[in-house]
């Protein structure tokens, strides 16, 4: 039989993505300072879609940006530039990509992406949704873990610099909770490292599943 195997196609796709990332970093470096960022046709927006997908709906391992809170997006871009957001994916991809963004460009990008329509990933385990909902809404008093709803809102919509979690991809939510528990972002001053470190893998899976379905 002839043709390209799925494995080879996957490797080729990976190479294409990495090349795109490198080109994006170069383009941002040369263009971000002189081009309005908050526009659908701006180089900065187009570069973001290399990893975050068309319409910024997310593309593994990059999260959905569409509909995310602008204050959160802006603070995270600042965290990438200062290296405060220090997990492996941030170091590999976003430290370089955000390095040359001005504060104004970061603000414009955050406003632009926050205004885009979003759709829930809906890719979690439906059998875990009920358990995840209970953890989100009630917390785990026996482990001194406050309910997620207290900070992230009844529909996981977030507030201010607290992110919207509703509808994000299962894999992103799971990985982020695991990284919080592993001690990343300790210098952010956020309570999540302590909270996530008390969650078991099964509890993380349940939470991520529940959140992935929220519209």
Please give the residue ranges for each predicted region.
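Electrostatic cytochrome c docking/interface patches
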Residues: 31-45, 55-61, 115-141, 163
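The canonical Cys-X-X-Cys-His
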Residues: 47-54, 109, 145-155, 207
């Amino acid at each position: 039989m002839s043709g390209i195997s799925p494995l080879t196609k996957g490797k080729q796709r990976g190479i294409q993505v990495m090349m795109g990332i490198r080109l994006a970093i170069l383009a941002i470096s040369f263009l971000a300072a002189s081009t309005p960022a908050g526009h659908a046709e701006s180089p900065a927006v187009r570069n973001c879609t290399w990893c975050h997908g068309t319409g910024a709906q997310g593309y593994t391992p990059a999260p959905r940006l569409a509909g995310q809170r602008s204050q959160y997006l802006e603070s995270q871009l600042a965290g990438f530039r200062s290296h405060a957001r220090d997990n492996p994916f941030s170091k590999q991809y976003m430290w370089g990509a955000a390095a040359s963004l001005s504060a104004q460009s970061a603000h414009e990008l955050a406003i632009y992406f926050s205004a885009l329509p979003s759709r829930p990933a809906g890719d979690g385990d439906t059998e875990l949704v009920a358990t995840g909902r209970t953890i989100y809404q009630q917390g785990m008093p026996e482990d001194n873990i406050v309910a997620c709803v207290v900070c992230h809102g009844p529909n996981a919509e977030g507030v201010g610099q607290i992110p919207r979690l509703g509808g994000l991809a299962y894999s992103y939510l799971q990985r982020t909770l695991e990284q919080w528990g592993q001690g990343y972002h300790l210098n952010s001053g956020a309570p999540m490292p302590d909270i996530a470190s008390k969650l078991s893998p099964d509890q993380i899976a349940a939470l991520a599943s529940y959140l992935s379905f929220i519209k």
